[in-house]
Design a protein with these regions (language model features):
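Conserved Rossmann-like nucleotide-binding pocket used by diverse enzymes
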Residues: 2, 25, 55
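Non-catalytic, surface beta->alpha helical segment in thiol-disulfide oxidoreductase systems
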Residues: 81-107
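N-terminal "domain-start" segment that seeds a small globular fold
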Residues: 1-13
């Protein structure tokens, strides 16, 4: 599984089908870096073979997306199922919490 960097133009198509986790972050955000490391090193390996996607949206590069989903603090994780927002988590999360939510949405 590879983490996909999304822009505004590609967002809707990326979340349209299946389960998609989107990490809203910024380069200057310390907790975002921690969450990014957790996603890359712990969540991705646990979700290998699972029918889901993990994407990232830089809020500085895509402020309209952050506004659209009322992302007021970062990191914010949004979970989509077939294009609909299904769950939201703010601040740094444990890998178990993130993986658990993805698997819950798949079942």
């Amino acid at each position: 599984m590879e983490i996909i960097n999304l822009t505004e133009g590609a967002f809707d198509a990326a979340v349209a089908q299946g389960v998609t986790l989107v990490d809203f972050w910024a380069t200057w955000c310390g907790p975002c870096k921690m969450m990014g490391t957790i996603l890359e090193q712990q969540v991705v390996p646990q979700l290998e073979g699972v029918d889901a996607r993990i994407c990232k949206v830089n809020v500085d590069d895509s402020p309209a997306l952050a506004a659209r989903f009322e992302v007021l603090s970062i990191p914010t994780l949004l979970f989509f199922k077939d294009g609909a927002l299904a769950a939201r988590m703010e601040d740094v999360q444990t890998p178990e919490t993130v993986v658990g939510k993805v698997k819950e949405l798949i079942s």
